[in-house]
Amino acid sequence: MSARPEALVAIYADESCLGNGREGDNPGGAGVLLEFRQRDAEPLVRRDLWVSEPATTNNRMALRSVIESMTAISRKGRRFRVTFTTDSRYIVDGMTQWVHDWARRGWTRKAGPIENLELWKQAVAAASEHAVYWRWVRGHAGHAQNEYANDIAVRAAGDQSSSAGLVESGFDAWISARLAKARPTVLEPFPDGAIFRASRTLPTPHPASP
């Protein structure tokens, strides 16, 4: 990674699994909105990213949102400060608490096998490339960027598509349509880099099983 000063990126992520918890193959998707500035005081740049799986769970897709978004920004060849906003307690609690306990125990836990262990390891490895603040918001509460990420995830789950990386965002058109319908919407301001504080440094992921 480049040693240039760490730029700030805001990531909003959500996941969808159609029929989550039901028997059979339940298709799912993960949706991500990224916001950043090329230079200070310039307008925000937005990019979308989405992935899908034909048979999955909400938790798997939440982890995929971390892996895919962190991997995408790592391709820029530099380290970023990242505010990762999600309505998934599974991700926020996992990244700020559980992974540290699991790592101390050699990536095991007393209660039995760790669900989605290999995805957790991949998520930790991908996020460790950056300084990340893990932020939870209540889902479906009018938070514009996360509502948008949810819509991307639902669409990806339904049509089983992938953006194959970062693409131009449709957020501006989406929020204009939402405001025109007078739907409750709170546009999150871009994070203030002057007060950014990363969450606890992630542990080193245990080598993946052969």
Task: Label each region the model flagged.
Residues 35-39, 59, 107-111, 158-163:
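Glycine-rich loops and low-complexity Gly/Arg-rich segments
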Residues 1-60, 71-72, 187-210:
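RNase H-like nuclease fold core
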Residues 158-210:
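Acidic two-metal-ion nuclease catalytic site recognized across multiple nuclease folds
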Residues 15-23, 27, 67-148, 174:
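RNase H catalytic domain
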Residues 44-53, 117-125, 168-176:
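Low-complexity, flexible helical/coil segments
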Residues 62, 66:
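Short, conserved alpha-helix that lines the donor NDP-sugar binding/gating region
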